[in-house]
Regions:
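Terminal low-complexity, poorly structured segments
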Residues: 9-10, 14, 212, 324, ...
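Alpha-solenoid helical repeat scaffolds
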Residues: 23-483, 509-519
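C-terminal interaction modules of eukaryotic adaptor/scaffold proteins
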Residues: 488-507, 517
Length: 519
């Protein structure tokens, strides 16, 4: 006798499964199978298997143990109950196989259950039974290969995919292998992914495959130092992106890949390749505009930054400024991207001859950082460089006035951020030397002395520290020797210059010829 609760559940199940017209009759039509499976999943998930199973048995019996229905019930007992009811799952799998011994999903589900129970050998056994039941059922090969892939057995997964290709000539084995190796997140895996993408079944490639394939060449470009090799990788990235764009013209990710590749190629080409740079700038603008149009919520600050570059390369400065302002004012943008955006806005203003707007932009940003104590040397350097660029377009006192503005920024940067103070002093010497070309006024003495004293505290000097110390010694030695006519005072600087750089021609010449020293 059926329990009272079972009767209620059965009634609910039948009502949920059948349309009104069909409820007048028995569950006899297989057209209701998918709806029946869906309803059973809901009932099994929400009720105790002890009460539900007799109802499921009755429904399956009325459907003559339709294999799809039985496997649907088994799947629900295993995946939907929360307790992994293997007893009932296997019970309905057996019913499915009894009804149709070649019904592959029954074997696949059995393999999944054994794999979930960590019995790999049993799982493999049942996957192979599934293949024997139907060698042309592609899902079996994929499921078995992915199980091996998940355990890190990539060679075995490759063998299974190739086995599928042998049985089903249209099976995209190389594409599946490429996808598998792409997910390894290792450079050896990436190289294998590239090899298989090259021979992948193009007709089966989805938009995300083109994006993955293109991304691999972006990663390859980042790993090489040779400029030619970098350009070659970015060109391949663009080629793949454009193939993807042809097939999926509205896909955001392939458009994004095309945008990035075009910007990278443009940046790597020299000024002698002006025509090619224009070509890639046009491509970048095109793909950037389309990516933003199609991306909706996917569009992020990096996309706007790249699109801003494209517009700037196309000399569309007003439009570029607006795009970069989106990045600058975004709450989600990285600080590094905001700094890039601000510099690009300033550069665009400079191209438009609007130095005052660029200066205002930098100073407003600097004021905010000074207020919260986060201002660094490079914040001042940006403004100084702006003044230096402006000075190149001026003459006479106008030029000198702007150079002194740059000098003041370098001085503030050095005073604010001692870690980089040496660069500030170095740039002050350069500016003051350009104002006082013959060094008669000694305008560079103050920063040169500060730089010299700072470098004395650093011990052995290398790289940029060595470079700026050489500059300071040259300035001080020349000033005291030739302007102040004090060889005695100058000697310490020439000696320090030689000590810092024994190959320095000025030091060698002065010490051997003027001081008659043997080096």
């Amino acid at each position: 006798m059926i329990h009272f609760k079972n009767i209620l559940l059965a009634t609910a199940l039948l009502a949920a499964v059948l349309p009104a017209s069909a409820q007048k009759h028995s569950i006899s039509s297989l057209t209701d199978t998918k709806a029946t499976v869906k309803a059973m999943e809901t009932i099994i998930a929400k009720n105790d298997g002890h009460y539900v199973e007799p109802i499921i048995a009755e429904i399956c019996a009325k459907k003559k143990n339709n294999p799809e229905l039985c496997v649907g019930a088994a799947d629900a007992f295993w995946y939907k109950t929360g307790i992994r009811d293997s007893t009932n799952a296997f019970k309905y799998i057996k019913k499915a196989i009894a009804a149709n011994k070649n019904y592959v999903p029954a074997y696949i589900l059995t393999a999944e259950i054994w794999n979930d129970c960590q019995d790999t050998l049993k799982a493999i056994e049942w996957y192979n039974k599934a293949i024997q039941a139907d060698t042309l059922y592609a899902k079996t090969y994929r499921a078995l290969a992915k199980m091996r892939e998940k355990s890190g057995n990539y060679d075995e997964a490759c063998r299974i995919y190739k086995r599928a290709k042998a049985a089903i000539p249209t099976f995209p084995a190389n594409l599946e292998i490429a996808r598998m190796y792409y997910k390894t997140d290792t450079y050896s895996g990436y190289n294998k992914a590239i090899e298989h993408f090259k021979i992948a079944e193009v007709d089966s490639m989805e938009a995300y495959d083109y994006n993955s394939y293109a991304t691999l060449y972006n990663l390859a470009a980042e790993q090489v130092q040779d400029r030619g090799a970098k350009v070659g990788n970015y060109l391949k990235m663009l080629e793949i992106s454009e193939e993807g764009i042809q097939r999926f013209p509205k896909d955001f990710y392939v458009l994004e890949a095309g945008l990035l590749a075009a910007v990278k190629i443009h940046d790597m080409l020299g000024q002698s390749d002006a025509e090619k740079k224009r070509e890639y700038a046009e491509k970048a603008e095109n793909y950037g505009e389309r990516a933003i149009a199609e991306g909706d919520t996917l569009v992020n600050d990096v996309i706007y930054k790249l699109y801003g570059f494209a517009l700037k390369y196309r000399h569309k400065y007003d439009k570029a400024i607006k795009v970069f302002e989106r990045v600058l004012n975004s709450d989600k943008a990285e600080e590094a991207d905001k700094d890039i955006a601000m510099k690009q806005i300033a550069d665009s203003y400079k191209e438009l001859g609007e130095y005052d707007k660029a200066e205002e932009l930098f100073k407003n940003n600097l004021a905010k950082k000074e207020a919260n104590g986060t201002a660094k040397y490079f914040d001042y350097e940006k403004i100084a460089e702006l003044f230096m660029d402006q000075a190149q377009e001026l003459n006479g006192n106008d030029k000198i006035d702007v150079l002194w503005k740059a000098d003041a920024m370098y001085a503030k940067g050095a005073a604010t951020d001692l870690q980089y103070a040496g660069y500030g002093y170095y740039n002050q010497i350069r500016i003051r030397s350009s104002i006082d070309e013959d060094n008669k006024k000694g305008l560079g003495l103050e920063p040169a002395r500060k730089l010299y004293a700072m470098m004395l505290t650093k011990g052995a000097l290398e790289g940029n520290n060595k470079k700026i110390m050489v500059y300071a010694c040259n300035y001080l030695g020349s000033y005291y020797h030739f302007t102040k006519k004090s060889p005695k005072e100058a000697k310490q600087y020439w000696l320090k210059l030689y000590e810092t750089d024994p190959t320095n021609k000025n030091a060698i010449l002065v010490l051997t010829k003027l001081y008659k020293m043997k080096l």
